[in-house]
Amino acid sequence: FGITWAQSQIHSIAPEIKKPTKKECPDFDNEYDFFFDHGKRRIKIEVKASRAVDAKSEDPLFVKALALNSKKPFDMNFQQIKPKHCDVFVWVAVWRDAIKYWVFASREIEKNKYYSKGQHRGNTGEGQLHLNRENIKEFGKYEVQPKDLLDKKMNGAVS
């Protein structure tokens, strides 16, 4: 879902982050989306996005998109998560009337009980995580406001 949009959204909120180039990051091989130089530390950032839709509806996406306060079930599947390739994940979740952001250290994802390793058969180092009505509150400590995206949550995620 809309990774180009999500990357643009994150970059507009935090213009200090940069897209890696071979000049700045000679070993770069498209394994992360952005980097942020924090002191002497280069933080590699991967952006993931998903949307809240009625999990039981067969309607088109624009019809089954849920409002934030909806009581209907949803399942946001953050896919192709490769914790070894970045330091930090920024997740963007889109409801019909709201956008939420979470910042995680990659090691926190690897240890999360909802993270399933091996999204595809034979794929090592890649997994997925489902956010839904039943578990979303457990991720509250990782949620950030847009203005705080590069604040202590990001910096704390890699310390």
Where do the protein language model's features map onto the residues?
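Nucleic-acid endonuclease domains
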Residues: F1-Y32, D37-I43, K48-S159
